[in-house]
Regions:
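A beta-rich soluble binding module of mature secreted/lumenal proteins
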Residues: 2-5, 12, 16, 22-212
Length: 212
């Protein structure tokens, strides 16, 4: 089996995981009522332009491809059609592993204050993505899902204060997550492994010029 998370087989597994969640949600709505957890509350109105750019993944309840991610960075940029280009960059299994990337596309759900997105890894399936927390200074965010299957604590810097981390974990637990499933993502910068470079912002071109 190919162990490179950039391999199409890995990307397909990630897409299928979200597709299975989407199908389960559809089944519960279309058939007999199923016991469901409460919808994740949002962070309120989100300034989408300010939210764009690079986010270091501090901790997560991981999807299958990112279960051993190191130096994980999620980058966002607004497309001309209003959707959100996403670049998830990480190294699988160690700081010296090759860089792997995934490129889902986000769509903001109307009427959610820009706080709920649908992430598409594989057409036509879309996965719920809720901005559940956003610090007033815009430096930390907590992404959750109503199924409580995956979550991401992200920050504008590779490390955050212990108190901020504990507060985020308390919030995640209050939302109904099992903290035993949380994995702290190793972050070490600057990089020294293959393809060592600062993560290019999703809204920058190859020369570093911001795309308009």
């Amino acid at each position: 089996m190919d162990q490179n998370p950039s391999h199409p087989r890995w990307r397909l597994r990630a897409a299928l995981a979200f597709a299975a969640a989407a199908l389960a949600a559809c089944a519960s709505r279309g058939g007999a009522p199923a016991a469901r957890l409460p919808t994740i509350p949002t962070a309120g109105q989100v300034d989408l332009a300010r939210f764009m750019g690079d986010w270091y993944v501090i901790a997560h309840v991981p999807t299958w491809p990112e279960r051993a991610a190191f130096n994980a960075v999620e980058s966002y940029s607004l497309r001309e059609d209003g959707r959100i280009a996403t670049r998830f960059r990480f190294r699988h299994g160690g700081f010296d592993a090759p860089v792997s990337t995934m490129h889902p596309v986000g769509t903001v759900r109307p009427g959610t204050g820009n706080a709920v997105w649908d992430m598409q890894f594989l057409w036509p399936f879309q996965a719920e993505y809720v901005i559940a927390e956003l610090s007033p200074d815009g430096q930390r965010t907590l992404i959750a899902r109503s199924d409580r299957d995956y979550a991401w604590l992200m920050a504008r810097t590779p490390q955050i204060a212990p108190q901020a981390y504990e507060q985020a974990m308390a919030r995640l637990q209050a939302l109904g997550y099992d903290l035993q499933k949380v994995r702290r993502v190793p972050q070490r910068w600057p990089e020294s492994g293959p393809d060592a470079a600062p993560p290019q912002r999703a809204n920058e071109g190859p020369t570093g010029e911001v795309a308009r």
